[in-house]
Amino acid sequence: MFLVKSFHEGGLMMYPILALGVVMVYISLERLFVLYFRMNLNKDHFFKSLTTYLLKGDLEGMLLVCDQNPAPLSKVIKTCLIRLINKGTDADIQAALDEGALIEVPKIEKKIGYLSVIGNVATLMGLLGTITGMILSFKAVADADAATKAAMLTKGISEALNCTAFGLLVAVPAVLIYSVLQSRAQHLIDDINEVSIRTFNFILSNRERFGVTEAA
């Protein structure tokens, strides 16, 4: 098989590049599933359901909406609602939203930065393999006898080119998927910020209904 043959011709540097590729695939699949499925939540539908229960004064219903949608957004809002149920001040509610965001945002951004690192390191590993292959080629030209010179020169060039190719084969998808995941993470964080502000303003505009007092 062409890929297997190319891998063996690439020399020792192919193994760390392969390891980086395996890690890249694992992180990519895991983060794509988490960010696009497990953490997915329609913010407008969620906020509409939430305000319906808020206007009714149905505290159990509010928490049920959050529990039925176990996404970072709903978890942040749930911390706010718990503080509301406990008759916190507007400052307490704002602090609860901030606390919830500080807990959930790192979960959204988790592992994504590793893909950028893998992309850079895989490129450098490929470059290092290229350099070692070229060293082998120059050594063949300088030191080897005529009988082995052609074989060593071919081996060195093959090692250099295969390392470059495999390094880029890992680096390019890593960088592309990093960009996709980073964009998705920012979208989820923006949703948290938007719905947090909308919920906080909604509570303040119905201060008397919920018994929310101003901070001293």
Which residues does each PLM region occupy?
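Predominantly long cytosolic amphipathic alpha-helical stalk/bundle segments
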Residues: 40-128, 132, 136-146, 180-216
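Hydrophobic membrane-targeting segments
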Residues: 1-46, 181
